């Protein structure tokens, strides 16, 4: 993932991405979002209709979320089975889903030009879990040399 997206050439950006992946997956334990996904129903910003939330809840190391993002992944990798939802993506494409999202959203550019907080809000869409993300970022700064 780091090689495929260019993060391998930028140590601090790599730390930012690693910290966020650690947060999103509870240290790489969960490749599917723990919540039931109902909060994502009727979210046009995600491309979700009335019942799409649970099907298109977070999957993979960056917790790809929303019908729109799932369709982008399906189109990019030419696999329409992605539209089966979270179970398929979380087991089949946990890292590929992140790669495609990173590229589509220029996350490396965000990290390099705007820093850690912007990286977090780009990934999460808000400040959810920011304290844990900061703790993990500090850990990555200490351990990733």
Each predicted region: which residue ranges?
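Peptidoglycan-targeting cell-wall enzymes and recognition modules
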Residues: 13-102
């Amino acid at each position: 993932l780091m090689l495929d997206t260019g993060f391998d050439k930028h140590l601090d950006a790599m730390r930012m991405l690693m910290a966020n992946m650690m947060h999103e997956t509870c240290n790489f334990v969960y490749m599917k979002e723990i919540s039931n996904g109902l909060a994502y129903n009727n979210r046009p910003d995600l491309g979700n209709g009335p019942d799409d939330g649970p099907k298109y809840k977070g999957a993979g190391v960056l917790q790809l979320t929303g019908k729109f993002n799932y369709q982008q992944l399906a189109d990019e990798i030419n696999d329409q089975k992605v539209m089966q939802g979270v179970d398929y993506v979380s087991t089949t494409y946990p890292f590929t889903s992140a790669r495609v999202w990173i590229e589509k959203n220029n996350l490396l550019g965000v990290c390099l030009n705007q820093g850690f907080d912007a990286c977090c809000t780009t990934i999460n869409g808000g400040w959810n879990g920011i304290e844990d993300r900061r703790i993990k970022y500090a850990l990555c700064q200490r351990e990733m040399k």
